[in-house]
Amino acid sequence: MRIVCVVLLLSGAAWGQWDRFRGPNGTGVSESAALPAEFGAGKSLIWRQPLPAGHSSPIIAGGRIYLTAVEDGRLYTFCLEAGGGRIQWKQEAPRSRREKLHTLNHPASPTPVADDDNVYTFFPDFGLLSYTRDGKERWRLPLGPFNNVYGIGVSPVLADDVVVLVIDQDRNSFILAVGRGDGKVRWQKPRPEALSGASTPVVIERPGEPSWILAPSSFRMDAYSARDGEAIWWVHGLPSEMKSVPVIAGDLVYVSGFNTPENDPGRQVALPTWQELLARDDSNKDGAIQQEELSDARTKKYWGFIDTRGRGKIEEDEWKLHLSVMAAENGLYTFQLGSPGDATAGDATAKLVWKYQRAVPQLPSLVVYRDVVYMLNDRGVLTTLDAATGRLLRQDRVRGLSENYYASPVAGDGKIFLASHSGVVAVLRAGGEQELLAANSLDEEIFATPAIAGGRLYVRTVSALYCFGML
């Protein structure tokens, strides 16, 4: 029996770990063995497993692969064997409702998180669930309904002995921690400033002390104690919509945010104060602005975001929030990590190391790899920057490709992998020059971020999961 256990442990370890959205602490980086640059249906393919649709990314833990999907309108967590891709089990989650979603979102967008023994999944149409590695349900926690204009897309993470979930929405945003073992709520803290974001947090481990949970929000980023949810550290100065995952490299944290093109520096427009708006547009003199009263066509297109209560009118606090939203600037911001309470004045300038504000992505998160920042925007413009100084190394579309990107870049074995919506996975040599090694077409759409573990590259398309490696 002892020999069997050792073999099983080694077998699980051999497949490596990529146990949450974007892998080790959300960095998108693997210290994996050799990875192929060229791959496809007839090259470097270890296996292909057809799967129902879903936008969640594959994760790998304990020799198992986990992801979520929707099949015949039902919500499922899938477990695959890492070695051959065989489906080990699938478990259905209740579907209490159908949340409204942006066309690029999906009911199975959130990525699971796992340790060697258990997996934790989140479906916005139900809540949180946990299963053993063999598919036995351990607990479930109904949550919602939610009110995010895009639909909820954030993924859970593990911190110490809790599962953490950030729910940023149009109203009543919060961060929640539940016990890994029993699914009971340990703490829940409001995030009153947070709007419709989708940024999955990262964890700062502190030996002998509770970990910090680093979670971007509208206009700011907070570090919460995993023990009780106390806000310990924070900086201000971020955009209003945060969807990317922050990346910690050394003592710096990198995070990008994009709201609208009108939040780019130089494209912002002057907006009237509340009193000026009332004087101009409040024709019925009721102290509010009805949609039909609003005369500015540019502002009217954002009506659904401004009318946060959904009552068909704008009131003073909603307009002031809109002014703050439109005053914030898109950008990649790099901050120095701090000690507890050292930003109590709320002044981010003392912590800001550098920022960059051109071709900023809305959805893809960045990668910091071998002292270079790789920032890929939704339209396929790749920016490489010196990680220490922010000096621009190169900004260009990937050579010969004109693609949209919703998946985030990942890195390993001296290579950068970029998976486009149309199903082309470009492979670049690591470095600021953006040297293209190969462009591999899978002929299937991709929304999910690839995973790297144990010398294998896992790519999920809308219809299958591929495993590529050196043969």
Predicted regions and their residues:
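Noncatalytic, solvent-exposed loop/strand surfaces
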Residues: W15-L471
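Sec-dependent signal peptide recognition
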Residues: M1-V7
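N-terminal signal peptide c-region/cleavage motif recognized by signal peptidases
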Residues: S11-A13
